[in-house]
Regions:
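Intrinsically disordered, low-complexity acidic/polar segments
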Residues: 49, 66, 135-137
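Basic, amphipathic N-terminal segments that precede the first structured/catalytic domain
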Residues: 1-38, 45-47, 172-178
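Polybasic (Lys/Arg-rich)
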Residues: 134-178
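A residue-level signal for beta-strand positions that form part of recognition/binding surfaces
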Residues: 19, 53-54, 123
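Catalytic cores of nucleic-acid endonucleases
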Residues: 62-129, 133, 150-156
Length: 178
């Protein structure tokens, strides 16, 4: 079993066959420098007869406030959203290209469940988890991140609800954190 400590939260425990810590992987290291990436990819098997889901998870301990009266608040918020966009998109791309064997030795680096993933019907979720964030602060983040990832959602045909922003309380309810 794997647990991941990030941004003041403990994610997991997850089966080591279903969790790929992409941020700390040799695969990510080989793509450096300058490739920002999410923390991990997690296969969440849904109900019987439904396709598997891969949750690509980025964790943060705080976010900028877009409604702040500070002069650079909007710019800071836009930069934050751009960073999360890049991390989630890079993790999606690097994870899928590893699954299809585009990287040398990817099969040896990937957890077992990722090697046989039916990518043509796998559901992908791009997930941001913010520790200690109030529920009422989530909708503006959800909207901004969904807008930033709209091209990705369309080109990858991810479908409605593919971008998810949650706080630690919701993450706990969904079994992401202990």
């Amino acid at each position: 079993m794997i647990t991941i400590e990030e941004s003041g939260m403990t994610f997991g425990p997850f089966a080591d066959t279903h969790c790929f810590q992409i941020e700390n992987s040799p695969l990510h290291n080989s793509a450096q420098p300058g490739v920002q990436i999410a923390e991990f990819l997690l296969i969440r098997n849904g109900q019987e007869n439904l396709p598997p889901q891969v949750w690509i998870v980025e964790a943060k301990s705080s976010t900028p406030n877009p409604a702040s009266p500070l002069p650079d608040a909007a710019e800071t918020f836009s930069g934050f959203i751009a960073e999360i966009h890049d991390k989630l998109l890079n993790a999606l791309t690097l994870g899928v290209t590893a699954c299809i064997g585009r990287h040398a030795n990817a099969g040896q680096m990937l957890p077992q469940a990722f090697t046989g993933l039916p990518l043509d019907r796998t559901v992908f979720r791009l997930v941001l988890v913010i520790n200690g964030h109030k529920a009422e602060w989530l909708p503006p983040l959800q909207d901004a991140l969904a807008q930033a990832l709209s091209v990705t959602s369309r080109t990858w045909d991810l479908g409605a609800g593919s971008v998810v922003v949650m706080n630690d309380t919701l993450a706990r309810q969904r079994g992401l954190i202990a």
